[in-house]
A protein has these predicted regions:
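N-terminal loops that bind phosphate or other acidic moieties
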Residues: 1-110
């Protein structure tokens, strides 16, 4: 089990799941959550989806210094993720990372 997991927050469910799948194939032992799109299937970012993915990833990692990094595709996804972190019960375990989404996800996973 890894000490750090990854959440991919995107405006598109397909994009989030695709990036998570790619990173997961390259690092199968890493907890990776995908939070993309809106509940109705449309484009956008969902506070609830990001929160659920983050909670699942945090529950899957353990040990001293364990936590999660959140990678986003666009500015409003970053703002939504920032809100989730601010309201989190353990914000000290979460880091938002400003990087290219695909490359950053793969680098974080491996």
């Amino acid at each position: 089990m890894s000490r750090v997991g990854i959440v991919i927050a995107s405006h598109s469910d397909l994009l989030a799941r695709g990036v998570a799948e790619l990173a997961g194939q390259m690092a199968p032992g890493v907890a990776i959550g995908a939070a993309g799109g809106l509940e109705d299937g449309g484009l956008g970012t969902s506070y609830d989806r990001i929160e659920e993915a983050l909670e699942a990833v945090l529950a899957a990692v353990d040990g001293p210094g364990s936590g999660a990094v959140v990678l986003t595709d666009l500015g409003s996804a970053t703002m939504t993720a920032e809100s989730v972190v601010e309201m989190s019960e353990a914000p000290e375990r979460i880091r938002l990372v400003d990087t290219a989404l695909v490359e950053g996800a793969v680098a974080a996973a491996v």
